[in-house]
Amino acid sequence: FTEGDEGKVFLNEKNITNSQPFSIARQGMVRTFQLTKVFDRMTVIENMMFSGSNTKNDSLFRSLMKLSTQKNNENLIREKAFEIMKDLNIDHMADSYARELSGGQKKLLELGRSIINDPKILLLDEPLAGVNPKLAEEILAIIQKLSDQGITIIMVEHNIEAVMKISERVVVLAEGSVIADGNPEKVRKDPKVIEAYLGSGNE
């Protein structure tokens, strides 16, 4: 990742600026990627359970050992994985290999993997990139539902209309600088945003 030039990042009043990704995840912040990072040689359910085994209180190795030795723990993770997959409409693909999924379905799988450990903050990197309009609407509805459940969502997205539709606060960047920051209605009317992204027809 690119290191910041200045400033610090705090999570629950703790400085996490230089923390390792696994440490940040255990504190309740997880992320998805624009280019999905699913395990192509695993099935959909295996992808979900692998992520579900990485709990806050155990090392990854210890979690995997538990997964292989404690049937009860495995069943609990499997049940939770199926609940999430059902919400994401990918439960019918549980036994399919991740490499067989479309790009949009991989987006859903990665989203499911990110929420199986009940994060407090979810960072989404271009969740709608390369997704057809119908699936984009489904993903937006899922994101809204997660927000309604109390998960803080921080989303990087170039589909500005989608951003305006579900966001409480919008920060707009152009050429590396902040050009607007506020609620969607305020940002939509900002002259700099109109010039950079919306075009004169939206004035």
Where are these regions (language model features)?
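Conserved catalytic motifs of ABC-family nucleotide-binding domains
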Residues: D118
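Catalytic Walker B motif of ABC-type/P-loop ATPase nucleotide-binding domains
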Residues: L122-E126
